[in-house]
């Protein structure tokens, strides 16, 4: 009876050993662990980017082709402009007068003859020895000159023999060797004062002691003794009392 017990014990040990061995061999029978699928390889040569660019270009080319087809169907603008111009030429504007051409010719002749007439109106002849010339602002009135047998226009054909008043001063009576009776001294031509004794207009209503008198000499450059006047062109000044205004006549 002892044998079976021993055998039973031995069998139990074997079974236990077999269970342990089976449990130890179970994990080894499973497949080895595998890593996950690796990521896709990078685009080393840029093929995908180039393919995307090609697609974009093809799309743009398609858009451009569609626009070209649309433009080909449109009528050219030059034809429309020509049609409009032909219509305007054929149908005259009712607001434009029919006598426009004659007015243009009248304006042209008016523009051409206007300056000529204005130039002719300024021409004046002095005496037989004077040639015709354009009047200047300083040209005197030849008809009012009292010097007989002499030239009278100051400026272009004038001699110092005769002194005439300006056109703007008809009441001026300036003659050679006389006293100037002009109401305003600026009315007389400077060549008239070579041998006359004059008084400034601002000193006519004042006392002689408070004003200056100008004694004219023959030479124009003999007039630099007046301290207040530097540009004295025709007079030699003898001043008793210095006036607030220059004592010489400046022209």
UniProtKB/Swiss-Prot annotation:
Low complexity composition-biased segments: 14-28
Positions of the pro-segment in this chain: 249-251
Modification sites for Cysteine methyl ester: 248
Biased segments, Pro residues type: 29-41
Tissue: Expressed in flowers and siliques.
Entry's transmembrane regions: none
Residues where lipid is bound covalently (S-farnesyl cysteine): 248
Gene inactivation effect: Leaves with a roundish shape as well as rounder and smaller flowers.
Any one cellular-component term (Gene Ontology): plasma membrane
Biased amino acid composition, Gly residues: 1-10
Protein origin, superkingdom: Eukaryota
Residues covered by region (Disordered): 1-44
G protein gamma domain mapped to chain residues: 46-126
The entry's keywords: Lipoprotein, Methylation, Prenylation, Transducer
GO term, biological process aspect, one: signal transduction
Classification via SMART domains: G_gamma
Subunit text: G proteins are composed of 3 units, alpha, beta and gamma.
Function (record text): Guanine nucleotide-binding proteins (G proteins) are involved as a modulator or transducer in various transmembrane signaling systems. The beta and gamma chains are required for the GTPase activity, for replacement of GDP by GTP, and for G protein-effector interaction.
Record protein name field: Guanine nucleotide-binding protein subunit gamma 3
Lineage of origin: Eukaryota, Viridiplantae, Streptophyta, Embryophyta, Tracheophyta
